[in-house]
Amino acid sequence: MNLRLDEASRRATWPGYAAAVWGFLFAVPSFYWALGGTAGVESTISPQLVELARQQDSGMLAVLWVTGALKVVGGLLGLALVRRRPWGHGMNCLLQLMAWGAGVLLAWHGAQFIVQGLLVQAGLVEIPSESLPILRWYTYLWGPWFVAGGIAFVLAARAHLRTVPDHRHPRIAGVVGGLGALALSAVALMTGIG
C-alpha cells in the first residue's frame, strides 16, 4: 500500500519538474544573448530582433534580462509545485494563479507560432521573403517549445491541486490565472503585439 502511494506521488511530481527544467533551460539563451552572445541569434529569431541584438540596444537588452528572469521564476514555480510539505492557503492560491496563467499564456503563444507558420506554408498568409527561413524555427522549434512549457505548467498545476486539502479557492485562483492569460493574449493579438 505504501509503495503505491510513493509511486503515485512520484508520478504526480514529474510535470512540476518538467516545468522547472523548461523554465531554467529556456532562460539560458536569454541570458547568453543579453551578455552579448550571438550563436543562434541570426538563424532562430526575427531579423528585426537580430538587428537590435547586434546594436546591443538597451531596450532589447532589458527585454532579454527580464525575460530570462521570468523564465527562472517559471523554473522556481515548477519546483514550488512539487514541494512535498504543504504550503499555506494563500500560497496555494498564488501557485495555481501563476501556473495556470503561465500555462495558458505559453500554450497560446506557441500555438500562434505554429498556426501562423502552417498558414504561411499552405500559402494562405504572406510574410516578407526575408522572414521565411526564420518561420521554420518559429513553427517547428519555438512554437512547440512554448506549447510544451504550457502543457507542463498546466499539468503541474493540476497535480499540485490534488495535494491541496481545500481545493475551492486555489481552483478559483487557477481559473482566474488561465482566463487572465487568455484575456491578455486576446488584447495582445488585437493590438498587433502578440
Model-predicted regions and their roles:
Residues 8, 12-15, 79-94, 151-171:
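Cytoplasmic membrane-interface segments at the C-terminal ends of transmembrane helices
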Residues 16-35:
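N-terminal signal-anchor transmembrane alpha helix
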Residues 171-192:
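Final/C-terminal transmembrane alpha-helix of multipass membrane proteins
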Residues 55-79, 100-104:
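Core segments of alpha-helical transmembrane spans in multipass integral membrane proteins
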Residues 66-77, 140-156:
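Hydrophobic cores of alpha-helical transmembrane segments in multi-pass inner/ER membrane proteins
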Residues 14, 131-148, 169-176:
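Individual transmembrane alpha-helices with interfacial aromatic-anchor signatures
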Residues 42-57:
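Perimembrane loop-to-helix junctions flanking transmembrane segments
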Residues 45-49, 113-138:
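Interfacial non-cytosolic loop connecting adjacent transmembrane helices
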